[in-house]
Amino acid sequence: MTDKIRSVQGKVVSDKMDKSFVVAIERKVKHPLYGKFIRRTTKLHVHDENNEAKLGDIVEIKECRPLSKTKSWTLVRVVEKAVVA
């Protein structure tokens, strides 16, 4: 068994919850028959103790123990702040 902690980067798509937000992680998958690359999106609920992340930010998250029914990821750092127009 490996003890490597998974960490990924994604974009914050919702920050309406207290101490939580939703991250969308995009990946490209090749269609098995036609060979075209298709974008697939995974949405993850993330714990944010200090409410640091805002809508549109690029964040790095890591896997942790289950914190609730849907939350098992925590915020590591905000990689890039969203540009406010």
Swiss-Prot record:
One of its GO terms (biological process) is translation. One of its GO terms (cellular component) is cytosolic small ribosomal subunit. The keyword Flavoprotein does not apply. The keyword Chloroplast does not apply. GO terms for molecular function: rRNA binding; structural constituent of ribosome. Keywords: Ribonucleoprotein, Ribosomal protein, RNA-binding, rRNA-binding. Pfam families: Ribosomal_S17. PROSITE patterns: RIBOSOMAL_S17. Belongs to the universal ribosomal protein uS17 family. One of the primary rRNA binding proteins, it binds specifically to the 5'-end of 16S ribosomal RNA. Part of the 30S ribosomal subunit. This is Small ribosomal subunit protein uS17.
